[in-house]
Amino acid sequence: ELLPIFCFDPTDAPNGLENFWGYSPINWFTPHFEYLSNESAEKNREEFRKLVEECHKADIEVILDVVYNHTSEGDYKGPAICWKGIDENLYYFIGKDKNYQDVSGCGNTIAANRGLVRKLIIESLKCWASEFGVDGFRFDLGIALSRGENLSPLDNPPIFEDIECEPELVDIKFISEPWDCGGLYKLGDFPSKNTFTWNGHF
């Protein structure tokens, strides 16, 4: 399992330090430029494909740690880097006070069950599975993806139903953290029949 490799903001760290963990994504479709040796985006994609191929030759499956629960843009005072600059009212949960609702602990929470947002997440998963050949995904704070309007937990979140029904993802492994920073904890009761969950107590 690889730590997040989506393109992320390396300056998202306190006191002038550098963020190298990758849990502040900017783009869900692009490998982080500092992890690869080429300046060309296409050559970087080819390089990552080659990495996956070599792992498979050695009988090693590749699981990506993916962060779809928030972006690097922080709260409403943060910079407009990706989805905030396109349509913040679509991509994020925003309260009546205009502040971002946050169960990620990072200042914002992606509204994963809205139609266009779901489609973007599904297309990202398909890209990494079909184009790059990865074998599975581990959802960071995965239960946050089950939240609907007003952050209400959904019994049957459309995002997980879409994943289960997507032909290109039928053989892909899914693993999730069954908790978020808003207190939702669904170990043994995760709302997706094809997702394994981490046991935080263990």
Residue spans of the language-model regions?
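Substrate-binding/active-site clefts of carbohydrate-active enzymes
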Residues: L3-G133, L141-E168, L184
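Polar, glycine-rich mid-to-C-terminal structural blocks
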Residues: D155, F160-E164, D171-F202
